[in-house]
Amino acid sequence: MIKRVNKLVLGISLLFLVISITAGCGMGKEAEIKKSFEKTLSMYPIKNLEDLYDKEGYRDDQFDKNDKGTWIVNSQMAIQNKGEALKIKGMLLKIDRNTRSAKGFYYTNEIKTEKYEVAQDNQKKYPVKMINNKFISTEEVKEENIKKEIENFKFFAQYSNFKDLMNYKDGDISYNPEVPSYSAQYQLTNDDYNVKQLRKRYDIPTNKAPKLLLKGTGNLKGSSVGYKKIEFTFLENKNENIYFTDSLHLEPSEDK
């Protein structure tokens, strides 16, 4: 009888040990993912993007020794109301640390998918440059609304704040060492600082609080080949989609 009890106790102890190790591994990977993103997100907010001319980023053997690198920043909002096309507006900017110049484009898109048809992409690009932290069109823009949107545009990196990133809990963690790829997703509330900032700047047609997705590929410790992006998903189903995406990373300059 005593032997049976001892075996039962031993079995329960082993079960708890396995559960603890598994949970610990999951928590460890979540912490790694957060730490990987924190390297960049801790810089937010970057109110003056020209500060990036003097900001170092992750470098590996993909960089020429004389290349300081180019920061690529991209922010976009996508909204699809029921029965309508997916409408996207955003800006991509390349901030060259070698030439201390920045250029890119503001873009709009309407993606329509009719039954049994391939999605139709209608992207328009409006070339821009950045001078004194302001965006200026380098070609004539006839649409007055687009002119204003370019002049008033702010990248997410300029107004967001992730000081509480390490406090996010109960994330849905995914890690594939073969690719490698990784992600962590968190349910936010409408009281979250960054959610408030997005609602302040965009007409978001839902009161639902978004999920925050931290997603990347490449080495968790750093890679110029992979990518990292963050996404706020307010609504996602067959007929309606509302999401905001942002990315900021340093990559080798094109002319080096």
Curated annotation (Swiss-Prot):
A lipid is attached at residue 25 (N-palmitoyl cysteine). Residues 1-24 form the signal peptide. It holds the Pfam family DUF576. Keywords: Cell membrane, Lipoprotein, Membrane, Palmitate, Signal. It is a lipid-anchor. Gene3D superfamilies: 2.50.20.40. One of its GO terms (cellular component) is plasma membrane. A lipid is attached at residue 25 (S-diacylglycerol cysteine). Its main location: membrane. Belongs to the staphylococcal tandem lipoprotein family. This is Uncharacterized lipoprotein SAOUHSC_00053. It comes from Staphylococcus aureus (strain NCTC 8325 / PS 47). The lineage of its organism: Bacteria, Bacillati, Bacillota, Bacilli, Bacillales.
